[in-house]
């Protein structure tokens, strides 16, 4: 248990809550730290509308690139400020380490701005928020680690059983023997990620009607030291 003395701070990323951070032992969500992403999402929507209008007007490439670059830089400043707030929150704990999902999506702003079926979160916002959080943590001297992302938004942080999401924002544990009933889904996910940092923490998920034995998804927490890439 080489990292048992570290305080893992799980950070869940989303559009409504850009960052939700919590250590595994936080007694309730009032001690977690959340940064709302709604304004950034609205600005990304505006930027897409702006590019659509420029393309419709037949604006030249230089004009479009200059417009996008200026607004993108403003968005990155906002995301960096949010990431800094998360790092300050984490640094208040003893021997903190930030724990995020092991995802490798690369941000692609042009996909969001021009592809008809693009999704702003997966195309740009979430990969960017992930990379910037790790970059800012690096600047702050805060250690980072990633853990497997599978089921992290569905698993109960307390008992490990897969629950459900009755309204998207709420997580509900379906295990009748668990003390968790319902709670904020993002807060639950942050705690699941923090929990996975420690050795031996495996997902307890069993398919409800499965007859196979001994092959649950093994989600052994792992640490990685990854150098960071700046978003384009
Ligand atoms: Zn539970």
Predicted regions mapped to residue ranges:
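Substrate-contacting helices/loops that form the catalytic groove of nucleic-acid
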Residues: 1-126, 208-232
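Positively charged, low-complexity nucleic-acid-binding target-recognition regions
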Residues: 1, 131-232
